């Protein structure tokens, strides 16, 4: 089964129901829920989503509720001290993107799914937009 590492922007689209991007995010997570693909989401993505919820004054009980539901069927990737050190020495300009990339590799993901492919130009694994992901899955 394919292991797809989900970037923070896709998780945020789902949790905050971002109108323009919500259908793709819903479809990605529905595929994971149906066990058609194994989704991997970083602990950092959960933290970033909670931070954004507070920053933009979303009802936090709803944010936590949605994240708990998601955590029930995705693999949550841990961040280790070694991950932090490796990313600091990686040479990437964006620490958060480098952390996601390194975590995806550690989790043996087949791809990273993101709306911002340009953030992963130096990726050692395949990076897909949601549309490309659906094409690869033969879905939508």
List the predicted regions and their residue ranges.
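Residues in flexible loops and secondary-structure boundaries
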Residues: 19-23, 78, 84-87, 95, ...
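Acidic, PIN/NYN-like endoribonuclease modules and their adjacent C-terminal/linker elements
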Residues: 3, 73, 102-140
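Acidic active-site catalytic centers that drive phospho-/nucleotidyl reactions
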Residues: 7, 97, 116
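Alpha-helix capping/helix-boundary segments
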Residues: 10, 45, 83, 100, ...
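Residue-level preference for alpha-helix termini and adjacent loops
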Residues: 9-15, 73-78, 94, 119, ...
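Short, well-structured N-terminal submotif of metal-dependent ribonuclease cores
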Residues: 1-41, 56-61, 122, 131-140
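PIN-domain endoribonuclease scaffold, especially VapC-family toxins
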Residues: 3-4, 26-94, 98, 102
């Amino acid at each position: 089964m394919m292991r797809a590492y989900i970037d923070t922007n896709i998780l945020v689209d789902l949790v905050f129901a971002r109108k323009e991007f919500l259908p793709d995010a819903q479809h990605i997570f529905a595929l994971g829920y149906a066990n058609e693909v194994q989704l991997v989401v970083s602990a950092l993505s959960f933290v970033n989503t909670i931070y954004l919820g507070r920053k933009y004054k979303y009802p936090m009980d709803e944010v936590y509720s949605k994240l708990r539901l998601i955590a029930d069927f995705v693999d949550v990737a841990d961040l280790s001290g070694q991950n932090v050190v490796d990313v600091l020495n990686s040479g990437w300009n964006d620490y958060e993107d480098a952390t996601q990339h390194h975590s995806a590799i550690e989790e043996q993901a087949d791809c990273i799914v993101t709306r911002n492919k340009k953030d992963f130009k130096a990726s050692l694994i395949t990076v897909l937009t949601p549309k490309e992901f659906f094409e690869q899955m033969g879905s939508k």
